[in-house]
Structures are given as C-alpha cells and as structure tokens.
Amino acid sequence: MNRDSPYAATSELLADLLNDRRFRSGEFLDWFYGANPRGKAIVEDIDDDAGKRIGHYGVVPTRYRTPAGTTPFIFTSNVATDPGARRKGLFREMAERIYPRAAGIGAPGLAGTSNAQSSAVIINRFGWKDLGSMPAVFTVPVVWPRGVRDIRVDDAFLASDEFAALASDLDCVPVRDWVQSWDAEFLGWRLRNPDSTYTLHVGPDAVAVSVRDHGPLGIPAAVVCKVFPRPGAKLPVVAGRYVAAACRAQRAPVCVYGGWNAHVRVRGVKVPERFRPSPLVVVFKSFDEDRAPTPAFRIDTWEFLDGDVY
C-alpha cells in the first residue's frame, strides 16, 4: 500500500471490514476517490485517540440528467465503522457533516445501493427513500451474437479514436425521470477501475459492457454491467445478442444482469435473493425537495456500472 496516499488509512479500514482484495493495495481508492473527472470524493473520517481510523463515509460526485437538463449529483459509496466503535453514532456524525458538503456542489440529492440491513436503518432513521431491490436475472445465450464485436478494454483502447467515437453520444436516449449522465471522459474513467477487467460488445444498436465473475454454485458467468443504446437504435433494444457476446468473450456458459434499463430488455430467470450473496437495495436521499422531491423521485436506468459493485 502507498502510505503517502491521502486514502491509505481509509483503504486499510475498508480492506479489514469490507473487501480485502479490492482495498488492500490502495489503488482502488486512489482511482475511485482521487481520479474521478467529475470531482474528488467527498469524505468524512473519524480517528480514535491513537490516530487509528475507526469511521469512514465517502460519496462521489457525478451528474444526472432529467427532461430539463443535467445537474450535479452524488453517488453514495463506502461506509464503514470499526466493530469496537459501533452504536456510538459515528455514521450519524459523519452523515450530518457530509450532507451539506455534498449539497454544496449543487447536487439536489444522492443515490446508491445498500444491503437490506443497512437500507432499513438509513430509510427509517435518516429519511432516505427505498427505490426498490436491484433485480438480477440469470440468462443463457439463445441467439447468435450477430454483428457484435468484442473489444478488451485497456489503456491503449481508451486513448483511441475508436473509443472516443463509440462514446461520443452515450446520452442519446430520452429520459423520463432521473438517470446518470454519461460521456466519453466519465466512461473512460469508470473503465479504468483497477479492480475489474472489462470487455465492450459493440453492435449495430448498442454498446454493452461485461466482466467475468461466478454465478450460482460457482459457475463461471459473464456479468453484463451496462447497455448503452446507440443513436438511431429501435427502442427498446433487445439484449439477446449482447448476452451471447458477453458469454463468448468471458468464456462463460451463463450470464447475469443486474438492475433495470428503461430502453433495454434483458430476458432471463429472476435470481432468488437466497442465491445472491448480498441483495442490493437502490436508495435515494434528497437535499432539495423543490428540485428533487422525494415522493416523485424515480431512476429510469440503474445497472451495475452505475454503482461500484463491478
């Protein structure tokens, strides 16, 4: 771990409590918190008297769009408190400091995912809204991936004219309520995640993003993390050819898709929550009820790449 990183102590805490593989080296937070083109992470930390980090809450600036245009927004990310310091109100202390700082960038609210236990706490005690469980479907290739090219993502590809062209109009589809806004710079940053290796699947009506993981019973699985309809596509895009391409590229017999997309249809069998290691709930908190009223807030599209699972 790079001890000179401003996130070194936080990486150590998150490695101990959340995910050792992802956080231990420190590279993930240097990227996720420090290299975001939409702004560095807004963080609140609590250390004990000996200087050990015992509490952390981090949120990440992004942009959302509505029919009226785009606005700064916030993705709520990592929360951790040392087991020895729990039930001391550390999350409340950090949240009360971070909310006004997040609102200060012009964001009317924040959204993210939480497990069922944590979501119950923030909904009941902190005024967040439950936007629904993030569904997951299990599917297999049933059509040939006709017309779809697979591109392994690396630094050279992300710096290429081809990537710039593919990512030139990611927000081409209409929006009804709220949705994360994407452009080439933001997608390029997102695909530089040091914890994942992505493949793009470029077809006539969409660009999909996949990674390799394991599904139920440890079966190798392609995970479709995002589907971007291309300009001129007939909506909704039927994702069968992209599922097949993802399985081909990831050398997996099955595919998992999580979330929902207002302009894409992914057919499959819903994965029961008992087979999911950590079922996720999509949650929202408003900072400005005039701009983002809680009762009416909806997200058109939420997929794995809109969060930080992959």
Where are these regions (language model features)?
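Amide-forming acyltransferase catalytic core, primarily the GNAT-like/NAT-type
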Residues: 3-49, 103-105, 119, 124-226
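Basic, Lys/Arg-rich alpha-helical nucleic-acid-recognition elements, primarily the DNA-binding modules
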Residues: 29-32, 58, 78, 100
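Extended, composition-driven regions rather than compact fold-specific motifs
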Residues: 39-45, 53, 258-260, 267
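Conserved GNAT-family N-acetyltransferase fold
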Residues: 44, 55-57, 74, 79, ...
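Acetyl-CoA-dependent GNAT
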Residues: 50-54, 58-67, 210-216
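Active-site/acyl-donor-binding loops of N-acyltransferases
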Residues: 61, 108-153, 208-310
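A conserved beta-turn-beta hairpin within the catalytic core of GNAT-like acetyltransferases
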Residues: 64-76, 86, 214-224
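Conserved acetyl-CoA-binding loop-helix of GNAT-fold acetyltransferases
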Residues: 78-81, 86-101, 233-245
